[in-house]
Each structure stands twice: as structure tokens, then as C-alpha cells.
A protein has these predicted regions:
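Charged phosphate-binding loop/patch that engages nucleotide di/tri-phosphates or the phosphate backbone
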Residues: 137-157
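Conserved Nudix-box catalytic region and its N-terminal flanking loop in Nudix hydrolases
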Residues: 24-64
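Short connector loops at helix/strand junctions that flank enzyme active sites
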Residues: 15, 23, 43, 70, ...
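Hydrophobic/basic alpha-helical segments enriched in Actinobacteria
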Residues: 17, 23, 73-76, 120, ...
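Short, solvent-exposed loop/turn elements at beta->coil junctions and helix N-caps
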Residues: 8, 76-84
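Acidic, metal-coordinating catalytic segment for phosphate/diphosphate chemistry
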Residues: 1-19
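Unchanged
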Residues: 48-71, 81-134, 155-157
Length: 157
């Protein structure tokens, strides 16, 4: 028996993503987005761009998807989730973020229908509309007080 991990299968892809967990008066900022599975709910989230820091990606994705400017203040968690077809594994860095402004009239990213504010219970009542299990998990971890300092993450240019 080999002590080495198996070779990764051909076609396996790792996607690094970020998500902003933004709470205001007991409601969380979410997006309704079009997916191949229909309209789904998600945090403002997306892929890390080449050369971009995780913190910059979090702020950028929130702005592009909701027109809200946000400032990450803590890491909520790091989540590994393999898509059901096994072709993609997502590693999501979820950040607690504060609102820092709103750009009225900003055109949202393609596929984003609108930004919505929902309570945890409202979100939990419609699991069939979640983009992934990470949507509620990140909010539950946030509500459980999980916060890690941002200096845990190092970005080198």
C-alpha cells in the first residue's frame, strides 16, 4: 500500500473563490443569480483574479454583484466543496465585511438579477434556492462568532 496520495484525475479543476458575509440589522446581503440550475441565492462571491489579493477580490465581487462597497474585516472560514459532478472543487474564503457605500445606478455583473437582504431564517427556509451548501454554512459560522484576523492571510506581489 502506497503512503502517497493518489494522482489527481485528469480534468480535475480547483477554483479559488471569495465570498462577502455582510450583515445589516439582522439581514444578510445576498444575490439572486442565474445558473444552469435556475435562479439561485448566494453571497456576493466569485473567483480570485490573477494577481489579485483575496481581500481585494472580496471587495471587488461585492461591488460588481451588488453595487455595495464593502471592507473585509475578518475571515469567517475557508471551505472546500467538490461539485456533485466531481469535475470542480471550490475553495472558498468567506469574509465578514462592513458596508462602506453604495453606487446608485451601477450595472451589476452579467447573470446577477438583483441584490437582496434576507434573515438567516428566511434563507434557511428555501434550501432549494441556494447556489451551494456553503451559502447557509458561511452565515451560520458568522453567527456562531467565527472570526479570524485578516493578518492570517499573506499576499505577496
Amino acid at each position: 500500500m502506497s503512503v502517497f496520495p493518489p494522482e489527481p484525475k485528469m480534468g480535475w479543476n480547483l477554483h479559488v473563490t471569495v465570498a462577502a458575509v455582510v450583515e445589516n440589522a439582522g439581514r444578510f446581503l445576498l444575490v439572486e443569480e442565474e445558473t444552469i440550475d435556475g435562479v439561485r441565492l448566494n453571497q456576493p462571491a466569485g473567483h480570485l483574479d490573477e494577481g489579485e489579493s483575496l481581500l481585494a477580490a472580496c471587495s471587488r465581487e461585492a461591488l460588481e454583484e451588488t453595487a455595495h462597497r464593502v471592507v473585509p474585516r475578518a475571515l469567517v472560514g475557508v471551505y472546500q466543496w467538490p461539485r456533485s459532478d466531481g469535475e470542480i472543487t471550490y475553495v472558498r474564503f468567506a469574509f465578514a465585511a462592513d458596508l462602506a457605500g453604495f453606487e446608485e445606478g451601477r450595472v451589476l455583473d452579467k447573470g446577477i438579477l438583483r441584490a437582496v437582504w434576507m434573515t438567516r431564517d428566511e434563507l434557511a427556509a428555501c434550501p432549494e434556492r441556494h447556489r451551494s451548501p456553503l451559502v447557509l454554512r458561511c452565515i451560520d459560522d458568522y453567527l456562531a462568532g467565527r472570526r479570524y484576523p485578516l493578518d492570517l492571510i499573506r499576499h505577496y506581489d
